[in-house]
Design a protein with these regions (language model features):
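Mature catalytic domains of secreted/periplasmic carbohydrate-active enzymes
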Residues: 27-446, 491-494, 500, 506, ...
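Bacterial N-terminal signal peptides
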Residues: 12-22
């Protein structure tokens, strides 16, 4: 077994060796050991791939929409990814610092990436003909990466499954759900017996009406009978406590340390490959990983390989940048737990033993103020280089770092305590935003759902967002501060990069006064300006490519007097 060469320090290497060994034995002996070993891995590669890559549209969902059903279902006859190299994929994952790989064995379109004996709609009947899953499973075993599969419960292609494309909106003429359920059991058993033991079987598509709680619970028990230490996600069934862990999608999950969870997110915008898709920056990728782990979760980061079988080179480069960062700072990620400080848009924390790693992602002020700890701080150091000054009182912990020592992506402060950090109850940080928790309103809310209400942009939680309906091109988002407040800085974080023109305004005697105009917002937008005093502030979106959605809208007061940090 080989291990990732990025973790060069003895401490980190020891952690990684223990984690990988736990999974490669060949799998942990018990279910609880399997869950703990998986939580320690922290970072995995998600792969959505199939014949649909020939069209560059979304897997499953574009069947019957952008691509006619008849054409979509014939794509496999032209699928010949001659440049596919399992070693290259797995090496990329390993050098990115990833510890497990999840492949779409079957998505909602029904196509199988292994030569299943229960259908003819599989990789063996393409011009390519090779068993992609076999090659990937073998490469993962060689490199110490845990091999896992994604398997869709719904199947819009299979005649026995009641619903069809587009998107499960049509009904098939002669469905037979009990027979389809047996097909599903046969295929998942086939995968475990031929490619296992697996780390995870990652289900999806459980939301549709044909799938019931009874089906889900039976499948879960059936698979645990085949492989007791198999980890299964919550989408196997219905209900808040289904499966072994939760799976927030395309968002950073809320801080949660009482049940395992994993954010699944795309490196670009589409799950399957799309030409010239918008890709996340190095900063956004690394900070996403840090925020997820700081919330006590894992990150399953998705790529969609091209039709020739390669992962797009620019995506490989981005993943390797993450690996380079983890080579330096992996000790703050692998084998840690989230907290004790709850994650915000500007800060995350992880801990192991008597050590807390404070990840400062954005300097909102000259210092960072944290809630007091019930344990003493023995020492403090700056892992990213330079000096740090920490002042602890009964009311707060204040951290100061000279500006030249602040890392543009993540300034990491290591705090050594006089006792274990694990027994410290999670601590919420005071918000730096004057808008946090204030009354909010908006011109449009996605499906009138409270889950996407305007308040989500002002909750200081990077995992929730205000969203608008599909097709909305103009919208506004307003906050009432309760009383006039002085602000000198606005910070915005947008999902999906849809805004093309906007203005920031404040209310003055019944009129809206514009104090800033801009075009794109993107993942991270900051505007500083001469202080203004107002009670009502709004973001007025004048032009967007589709329904705008905002993670965070923060209003900051003028900076306080600087906290002097001596070398």
């Amino acid at each position: 077994m080989t291990t990732c060469g990025h973790n060069r320090t003895a401490g980190v290497l020891g952690i990684v060796l223990c984690i990988v060994a736990a999974w490669a034995s060949p799998c942990p002996a018990t279910e609880s050991e399997a869950m703990q070993a998986w939580r320690d891995l922290k970072f995995g590669l998600f792969v959505h791939w199939g014949p649909v890559s020939l069209k560059g549209t979304e897997i499953g969902w574009s069947r019957g929409q952008q691509v006619p059903i008849e054409e979509y279902d014939q794509l496999y006859k032209h699928f010949n990814p001659t440049l596919f190299d399992a070693q290259a994929w797995v090496t990329t994952a390993k050098e990115a610092g990833m510890r497990y790989l999840v492949l779409t064995s079957k998505h909602h379109d029904g196509f199988c990436l292994w030569p299943s004996k229960y259908t003819d709609y599989h990789i063996g009947n393409t011009p390519f003909g090779r068993d992609v899953m076999r090659e990937l499973a073998d490469a993962c075993a060689e490199h110490g990466i845990q091999f896992c599969t994604y398997h869709s419960i719904c199947d819009w292609y299979h005649p026995d499954y009641p619903l069809g494309s587009p998107g499960g909106s049509t009904k098939k003429p002669n469905p037979n759900m009990p027979r389809y359920f047996q097909y599903l059991k046969n295929q998942t058993r086939e995968i475990i017996e031929n490619y296992g033991p697996l780390g995870i079987m990652w289900f999806d598509g459980q939301w549709e009406e044909p799938w019931t709680l009874e089906y889900g619970d039976e499948l879960y028990a059936y698979l645990k009978g085949l492989q007791p230490n198999l980890v299964i996600n919550n989408r196997v069934s219905k209900g808040g406590q289904a499966g072994d862990y939760d799976t927030p999608e395309q968002r950073i999950g809320n801080f949660q340390n009482d049940r395992p969870w994993e954010t699944c997110m795309t490196i670009c915008q589409q799950w399957a490959w799309k030409p010239n898709d918008v890709m996340k920056s190095e900063k956004e990728c690394i900070q996403t990983l840090v925020r997820v782990v700081g919330g006590d979760g894992n990150l399953l980061f998705n790529v969609g390989p091209m039709p020739d079988g390669r992962i797009e080179p620019r995506q490989v480069d981005r993943l390797l940048e993450m690996g380079q960062w983890l080579a330096k700072y992996g000790q703050t990620i692998y084998g840690t737990r989230g907290g004790p400080f709850k994650t915000t848009a500007s800060l995350a924390s992880t801990h192991r033993g008597n050590t807390i790693y404070v990840h400062i992602l954005d300097w909102r002020d000259e210092t960072v103020t944290l809630p007091p700890l019930p344990k003493g701080i023995v020492s403090a150091s700056l892992l990213t280089g330079g000096s740090v000054k920490v002042r602890q009182t009964g009311d707060a912990i204040v951290i100061g770092v000279r500006e030249e020592h602040r890392d543009p992506i993540d300034t990491i402060v290591e705090l050594t305590l006089d006792g274990p950090a694990a027994d410290i109850e999670p601590l919420a940080l005071p918000s730096a935003s004057l808008a946090a928790g204030k009354k909010a309103s908006a011109s449009n809310i996605f499906q009138n759902s409270d889950a996407y209400g305007p308040d989500k942009a002002f909750d200081d939680d990077p995992g929730t967002r205000w969203a608008t309906d599909a097709g909305v091109k103009q919208a506004w988002l307003e906050v009432d501060l309760g009383q006039p407040q002085t602000i000198s800085k606005v910070m915005l974080s947008e999902a999906y990069d849809r805004v093309r023109r906007f203005e920031l305004q404040y209310a003055d005697n019944g009129s809206w006064v514009t104090f800033h105009e801009g075009r794109r917002i993107g993942e991270e937008f900051t505007a500083g300006f001469e202080p203004i005093t107002a009670q009502r502030i709004r973001l007025n979106i004048l032009e967007a490519t589709d329904g705008p959605t905002i993670w965070e809208f923060q209003l900051l007061a003028p900076r306080k007097a600087p906290f002097v940090v001596t070398p």
